[in-house]
Every structure is written in C-alpha cells, then in structure tokens.
Regions:
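A conserved regulatory-domain signal marking ACT and ACT-like small-molecule sensing domains
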Residues: 1-91
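Glycine/serine-rich phosphate-binding loop and adjoining beta1-alpha1 elements at the start
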Residues: 79-260, 381, 385, 437-439
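Glycine-rich phosphate/diphosphate-binding loop of Rossmann-like nucleotide-binding domains
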Residues: 151, 158-176, 228, 234, ...
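Adenosine-phosphate binding glycine-rich loop
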Residues: 235-236, 346, 351-444
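Rossmann-like adenosine-cofactor binding region
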Residues: 304-365
Length: 459
C-alpha cells in the first residue's frame, strides 16, 4: 500500500519564444513528467515572446519541483512565476450574502426596514405561514458540520472544513437557486448537535448534515428526521447512495451485470457504505455482502439486512464491488476478477485506481471523482423545497436516481454535474414523488412541471 499524497494544483506563468511548436513542446514536457495540464490562458502575445498561465496538476510539492527542473531545461521557455491557483480562488471565501432588493433612497429604507417592515412582522404574528411568501426561509438550508469527517482529510475540525462547506453552498446556489448557510459546530456531542439543529431550524426550509463521522451521524439524522417538521438529509449517506445506485444502473447497461441479479459486496460500512447497502436492498430486494474495520459497523450492516463478509470473500465472489473505506490502495490488482464492476469511491485517492482495476480485468471501474454527489443533492433539495415536503422519502430519492439515469449519456456512468437541465429534471422528479408520497405541503400544477428553468413556484 502506498503513501498517500494530495493532488497539488499550481499555475505556471510561462514566457516562451513565439515560434511554432514551442507551446507543444512545453505541454509535452509537462505530460512526460507525470503531470496533467489544466487550463491554458493567454496573458499576452508579442512579436518575439508570448506569456501564458498554464495550470498543472501534480502529485505533491516534490513532484512540482521535479517538473519545474525539467521545464527549466527548455531553452525557449522561462517560468516567470508559480502561483497557487486554488488558494487564489479561495481568497476571501467563495460565498457571501447579497440583497435581493436595492436600498437607494429614504423611501426604500422605510420599506425595507423601519417603519414599513413592522407591517410584515405583524402579518407573521397573525399567521406564521406567511413566512413562505415574505421571507427566504423556504429556500434556505443549513449545511451543518462538526468537522469530524471532512472528505478524505478526516477529523480536522469545523473551521478547517469551512472551504468544503462553502463549496457546497456555492454549488447549491448556482445550480438550484437555494441559499446554503454554513453552520460550523464547536461540539462533537451528538445530543448537542441535535439540540443546536433543532434550535436554529426555524431559520431554514431544510437541514443538510455534512461530514459528520459515523456512527454518530446515523443517530443524529434519525433523531432530527423524527423530531423536526422540515426535511433533513445527510449528504454523505443519502446523497452518496443516490449517485452510486444511479451509476451502478448505468454501469449495468454496458457491463452485462444486472443489479437485481448481481452479488454485491460493500467494502467499508461508514456513512456512505451503510446507506448504499440500504438503498441497494430496497432497490434490488437482495442483501449485500459487507465488511469493515470494526465489528460494530458490520453489525449495523447486518441489522439493516446485509450479510457479514470479508475483503477476501467479497473480492473472490462479488460481481459488483463498492469500496468506501478511505484507505488508498486497499484493493490490490491481483484481487480483481475478470468482468467485475469496481466502484472505489474514496477521495482523494481510491482503494484501487480505475486504470489498475481495468488492467486487472474489471469490466467497469470508476472512482469518487467520477461518481460525484453534485449530480444529486441540488436537484433533490430544489424539488423537496418546491413541494414544501415535510421530509424526504425513499421514493423521492428513487425519483432522483431515475432522473439521473435518464440524464446520463450512453456509455457514461453519470451526467455532467454542471448541467442546469439535470438539476431541473431531478427537482421535478423529486417534487412529483413528494406529491405521490403525500409529504408535499404545496400543490404544484402542470405549469411548474413544464418550467424549463429553475424558478420558484407560486407560493
């Protein structure tokens, strides 16, 4: 098993001779030294020299140094500056609260604030349901984390996890028009987390739990679902399960392995793995084999209808293997059987790379970069809030899966997560399922389902 390094993205500002083939020689050198080329931006074009910003993706800082050493040997190229593209993008954060109205005069001020706002307050005193018309509560969600399970970084704390939570908020705003408000908790006590969420729930139309370690995340989700009258989702559980099942359905189209007939093995039974197992059981009617590092995790899997197994048994007998352990390199090439479907979903590095799995005989192999929760949660939340659903039912998640499968191009495992039409389709499917499940508190007419862009329905 290899040591894990995190990918590093840097921008090289390069001054190169304005001659045919020089740029090609530079990008070839980058590729030959094991780095990937990202965006190339022209800064200036001159008679003798051109200046370009070239994004490169390397394994670590040592690899970057080796790359720069090789580039320096190109006589026609000078590296003027090395910049951290990711840090530059995150400067001052990725989100901010903005007004939906302008205050440009005293008349505006009197309407937006005092004394005019008192009329709206009195209306809500008489009937709190007017909040759906006169506040942004229905289209705001709390994104709550205690920082104990941040991506592949683990227990790094809430503040260190804020860039991840900001990213979720930015994406759900762009793709679904929903205000995601980061809530960083300075506690890991499950009772305090539940109580905090309950105390602030009046501010929001829904609550998304994020990056909370198992097993506490299971108890927190179940308790909030039971005690709140607004929808609650844990993206690491249901969000991951939705996109994984959708991608497995897509994989069956060109692997020849049908989910309902396949033996499925789950390696890793934390928030993601356990939820994937529960979804697969509901979808296929068949239990999955499951293994994990702790007996408690395996016991929970069995309690939810799964079968206790081992890494060796799963790799030797399962048609489909889904790994969510967070342990890079756990699955060795020699373990892969010809024709298997391998989903190694841990980030930033998978249990086995798709290339290695395919080389070992896997019919289909992918990782967590390709199977991305982003294809699911924006549309799930949009449809849920549009229907003013009191909860998110399994049928609503299945409706999201169906929409994702239908939106996926032939030969692909998942659709483009940045396609606005995808999230609109998911939202419509989820909203219709909310109506059918009788958890919708808002009736939606045909005009809503015929909308071609995401916009708020009549309230």
């Amino acid at each position: 098993m290899r040591n894990v390094d995190y990918e590093v993205v840097r921008t090289l500002r390069c001054r190169n001779l304005n001659a045919p083939g020089v740029l090609g020689k530079l990008t070839t050198t980058i590729g030959q030294n094991g780095a990937s080329v990202g965006n190339i931006t022209t800064v200036s074009l001159g008679h003798n020299f051109n200046v370009r910003d070239i994004d490169v993706i390397v394994r670590n800082k040592e690899h970057l140094g080796q790359l720069l050493s090789q580039v320096s040997k190109l006589r026609e190229v000078t590296v003027l500056e090395v910049r951290d593209a990711v840090l530059n993008l995150h400067e001052n954060g990725k989100i901010k609260m903005i007004n939906t109205v302008s205050v440009n005069s005293m008349d505006d001020l009197r309407k937006v604030y005092t004394p005019g706002v008192a009329e709206v307050c009195k209306l809500l005193v008489d009937d709190a349901n007017w909040k759906d018309y006169y506040t942004n509560i229905p289209y705001s969600i709390a994104i709550i984390t205690d920082g104990t399970a941040i991506l592949g970084l683990g227990n790094i704390g809430s503040v260190a996890g804020m860039p991840v939570i900001e990213g979720k908020a930015a994406l759900i705003q762009q793709l679904a028009g929903i205000s995601g408000i980061p809530i960083l908790l300075d506690t890991t006590d499950q009772n305090e987390i539940v109580q905090t969420a309950k105390h602030i729930a009046l501010t929001f139309g829904g609550i998304q739990l994020e990056d909370i370690a198992s097993p506490r995340c299971f108890v927190i989700l179940e308790q909030l679902e039971r005690e709140l009258n607004i929808p609650v989702m844990h993206d690491d559980q249901q969000g991951t399960a939705v996109v994984t099942v959708a991608s497995l359905i897509n994989a069956s189209k060109f692997s020849g392995i049908q989910l309902q007939e396949a033996k499925i093995g789950l390696i890793g039974l934390g928030a993601a793995g356990l939820s994937i197992g529960k979804f697969l059981l509901r979808f296929t009617g068949n239990p999955s084999l499951g293994t994990a590092r702790t007996e408690a995790s395996i016991r929970r899997h069995v309690e939810h209808g799964g079968i206790a197994s081992s890494l060796e048994e799963i790799m030797q007998t399962a048609d489909i293997v889904v790994a969510t352990t967070g342990v890079a390199g756990l699955i060795e090439s020699r373990m892969v059987r010809k024709g298997q479907v391998i989903f190694a979903l841990s980030n930033p590095y998978p249990e086995i790379t798709p290339e290695a799995a395919r080389a070992a005989g896997a019919a289909v192999a992918t990782d967590g970069k390709a199977v991305n929760n982003l294809v699911g949660y924006p549309g799930i939340w949009r449809g849920t809030l549009d229907a003013k659903a009191s909860s998110i039912t399994f049928e609503m998640y299945m409706a999201a899966i169906s929409a994702i499968v239908d939106a996926t191009a032939d030969g692909e495992l998942a659709p483009n997560p940045l396609d606005p039409k995808l999230h609109l389709t998911v939202a419509h499917n989820v909203a219709r399922a909310a109506l059918d499940s009788r958890v919708a508190q808002r009736q939606l007419d045909n005009d809503y389902f015929e909308n071609t862009t995401i916009k708020q329905p009549p309230r």
